[in-house]
């Protein structure tokens, strides 16, 4: 799920693209964000559930979808059985500084500086090398990923708009 993480001290929100708070569905991720992300930060990214399937680590869309459930007991059970991760790809604010009008290259550099990663919160890989991107595109299909994303390095962040190109596998 696409999600924006809002952290201000102990307060953590996981906002969906539509503005719905997803935090109650991913309690293990809320705790990880408190441990692994800076005190005051807003990061755009995705919530994923990686699982070992047929000897390979893949992203499990079905396990992720099951997490949106009204029963707290089921959410807790699934949080233990199929723990989620947050994969950040864009920094919006840090320690009160707004980066949304900065070019993507600058936001990315700052994200790498402030989000050191951990067990549950990681940063997407990027490349500006065409051969590497083509290799990833081929390899990622077997990992359950739709494809790759291309962004302009000089683009500013546009809320509620897709300022990227999705290159998807043919289905």
Segments (PLM) and residue ranges:
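Catalytic cores of nucleic-acid ligases and guanylyltransferases
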Residues: 1-171
